[in-house]
């Protein structure tokens, strides 16, 4: 998280980010044959509406950074809820605040909304129902304050996002429609490397790509898409059961963090090719494997 703060300071005072420092634009040009784009010479994901900069720390882009924050957020919630020492609770709360600050720096609306749902789900699993109501009240008041008393630019951004008039939101909608049409016409798929943002996909002929479920559906058909969705639901369910029924605090932590991480990644999966985010994808599936092992052998 310190990298994110360092990145923010770097940008404000020296007008550079880690992406500039490590010459990411040159890497994309030479290795991926992608020309620099946007007002910052990187790609369009590094800026929001009105050329507002978005930060990625040392990750490939802000979307991957924000998705990875879900994992850290889930871990911080675990320590905050289950720590018995006051010092540890304060440290966990500080970590939560740093992560929330990082969400704003990455400015991924899907991940920020997902973080709220992750918090509610974590409090529900741990049976902190009063805190859920308090949190929802605070979030609602905060949203209403931002919507009615913030700058016009931010208010218009919220309106355009909800009504799909924002360029990014409209792009998602178009990609979803393309994917759904392809699945309807080809229910058994059109083949691999035909959808998504992976380097092996020819962007000139790709179909859809802003929804992980539709990407699998376009490429491998409806059956594969449904199986992938059921695997996610089953992993969340089994991890939750592991947390609720285990008597070992270490096993409970694995179940809790796994359930929250996979639950929190559902929204990013609906808006991006999120399985390409290697760090959070590999680590979260590793946690699923550990959770399933404990669920089948220890309960």
What is each PLM-predicted segment?
Residues 4-7, 66-69, 218, 224-237:
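Transmembrane alpha-helices of multi-pass, membrane-embedded glycan-processing enzymes
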Residues 88-91, 110-112, 130-135, 228, ...:
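Short, aromatic-rich membrane-interface segments at the entry and exit
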Residues 80-81, 86-92, 98-100, 116-124, ...:
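Hydrophobic transmembrane alpha-helices and their immediate junctions
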Residues 53, 149-220, 239-245:
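Long extracytoplasmic/lumenal interhelical loops at the membrane interface
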Residues 1-29, 33-107, 112-125:
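Alpha-helical transmembrane segments of multi-pass inner-membrane proteins
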Residues 74, 116-120, 258-299:
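Transmembrane alpha-helices of multi-pass inner-membrane enzymes
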Residues 9-21, 106, 123-163, 180-184:
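A membrane-periplasm/extracellular boundary helix in multi-pass inner-membrane enzymes
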Residues 7-9, 99-102, 140-147, 262-271:
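Aromatic-anchored segments of alpha-helical transmembrane domains
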């Amino acid at each position: 998280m310190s990298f994110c703060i360092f990145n923010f300071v770097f940008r404000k005072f020296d007008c550079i980010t880690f992406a500039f420092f490590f010459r990411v634009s040159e890497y994309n040009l030479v290795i991926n044959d992608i020309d620099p784009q946007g007002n910052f010479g990187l790609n369009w994901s590094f800026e929001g509406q009105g050329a507002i900069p978005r930060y990625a720390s040392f990750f490939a882009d802000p979307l991957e950074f924000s998705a990875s924050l879900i994992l850290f957020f889930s871990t911080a919630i675990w320590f905050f809820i289950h720590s018995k020492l006051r010092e540890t609770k304060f440290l966990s709360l500080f970590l939560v605040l740093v992560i929330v600050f990082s969400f704003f720096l990455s400015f991924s609306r899907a991940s920020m909304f997902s973080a709220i749902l992750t918090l509610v789900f974590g409090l529900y699993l741990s049976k902190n129902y009063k805190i859920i109501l308090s949190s929802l009240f605070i979030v609602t008041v905060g949203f209403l304050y931002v919507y009615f008393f913030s700058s016009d630019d931010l208010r218009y951004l919220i309106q355009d996002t909800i009504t799909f008039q924002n360029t990014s939101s409209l792009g998602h909608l178009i990609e979803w429609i393309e994917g759904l049409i392809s699945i309807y016409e080809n229910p058994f798929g059109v083949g691999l490397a035909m959808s998504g943002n992976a380097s092996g996909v020819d962007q000139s002929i790709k179909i859809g790509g802003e929804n992980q479920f539709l990407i699998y559906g376009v490429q491998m058909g409806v059956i594969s898409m449904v199986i992938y969705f059921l695997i996610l639901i089953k992993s969340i369910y089994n991890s939750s059961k592991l947390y609720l029924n285990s008597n070992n605090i270490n096993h409970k932590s694995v179940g809790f963090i796994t359930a929250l991480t996979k639950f929190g990644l559902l929204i990013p999966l609906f808006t991006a090719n999120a399985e390409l985010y290697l760090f959070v994808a590999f680590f979260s599936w590793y946690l699923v494997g550990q959770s399933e092992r404990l669920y089948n052998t220890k309960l």
